C-alpha cells in the first residue's frame, strides 16, 4: 500500500526497513509547536493573497488549534507510518476539517517547512539558554560580592601562584558566561531569517508574500535565496558551537569543584542537594553533579562534530541526510540546559572553607611576586634583577623550611643588603590581594565594584554585554 501523502508515483509501499530508517517522528515531534505556528501563518498568508478561500484558512486555523491542544494534553495519536511531524499534523487536520486540509500545503514543501520549524525551535532554545545563563551570572555575582574579600590561592599549572579572592574567581565565570550569551545572541541574529516560501528548492509560481510570513513568525526578513533556505543548517552549527564553548566553560568550573571538594584540598563544601553517597562506603560525599556537568560537555561537542560531518559533503539542495540534524542537537541543548541549572544550584549553595583557603593561599611562596614588585618600586631595581633576587630569597626560605614571611630579615639581607623591614609588610596574603588594584585585578574593592556593577546590569536589562 502506497503512502497517501507522496504515493502517487509509487506502485507499492516501502519495505519495513525503509520505513524504519525513514521515520523521524520520534525526534521531530518536538517541533510540533513550531510546525503548527508556521502552518497557521502560512494559511493566513495564502488567504490574504487570494490563493485559498478565507473560509478554508479559518477552518485550517481552528483545526490546527485543536491539534495543538491534543498534543499538549497527550491525546494526540502520533503515527510512525506518517513519517514525521508535518504529515502527522496534516493527516489529523484532514480528519478534523476534511478536504480543506489539503489546501494548507499549497506553495509549500516539507523542505522549507522543516527548515522553518527548526529555525523557530533553535531560536526558542537560544532565548531559553540566554535566560538560564543570565540567572547563572546573577548567582555568581551575588556570591562574588559575598566573598569579595575571601582570600584563596590562585593557580597556574594547578600550582599555587598568587593569592586572589574567591569573589574574583567567581567573577571570571560571570565574564565567560557574558561572552557565551554574546555568541548565542550573534547566532540568533543570523538565524532570524525565514525559509518559509522557498518551497522544495526553487521557490513557487504562486503569488505568495514571504515578507508577511516572515513577519508573522517574528523573523527579521525572508531568506534571499531559495536554495540556501532549504539546504543549509549553519544556524544549528553556529548555535551548537556557542553551546560547546559554554559547556566547556561549565566543565572547567565543574572540574574545579571536583578538585576543591576533595578532602585532600578542602577549599569548598557542596551542599547535600548536589552530592551523593556510596553504596558501600558510608563516609563518602561524591560531587556527582559537578562530574556529570563535566561529562555532558562531551555530548554537546559530539553533537557539533556529528552535524559538521553530516553537512560537509552535501551538494545543494536538500538531502535526506539533513534529517539527522535534530536528534544530536536537541540532546545537546537539553544537556547544556541541565548543566547550567546544576552549576547555578551548586554555586548558590556552596560553602567555602575560608580559613583553609587563606592558609592555602600562602603556600608555595605565593607572595614572592609581591616581594619582587617591592624591590622594583622601592629599590628601583629592574624587574628581571628583582625576579632573580627574589628567587634566591625563596630558595633560602625553602632551605630553612619556613614561609617567606617567616624568613628572618637578616637572611633576606644576605641576598640583597638594601632590603628593609618595610618589605615584610607586603608578604601577607591580605596585603597581596589588597595591592592588586589595577583594572580587572583581584583587590577586594575591585571585586565589590565589579560584582555590584554586574548585579545592576543583570537586574536592569539582563544584557550579555
Curated annotation (Swiss-Prot):
It catalyses: 2-(N(omega)-L-arginino)succinate = fumarate + L-arginine. It is an enzyme of class 4 (lyase). Pathway: Amino-acid biosynthesis; L-arginine biosynthesis; L-arginine from L-ornithine and carbamoyl phosphate: step 3/3. Coiled coil: none annotated. It is found in: Cytoplasm. One of its GO terms (molecular function) is argininosuccinate lyase activity. Keywords: Amino-acid biosynthesis, Arginine biosynthesis, Cytoplasm, Lyase. Its EC number is 4.3.2.1. GO terms for biological process: arginine biosynthetic process via ornithine; L-arginine biosynthetic process. One of its GO terms (cellular component) is cytosol. InterPro entries: Arg_succ_lyase_C, Argininosuccinate_lyase, Fumarase/histidase_N, Fumarate_lyase_CS, Fumarate_lyase_fam, Fumarate_lyase_N, L-Aspartase-like. Its main location: cytoplasm. It comes from the Bacteria. Pfam families: ASL_C2, Lyase_1. PANTHER family: ARGININOSUCCINATE LYASE (PTHR43814:SF1). Belongs to the lyase 1 family. Argininosuccinate lyase subfamily. This is Argininosuccinate lyase.
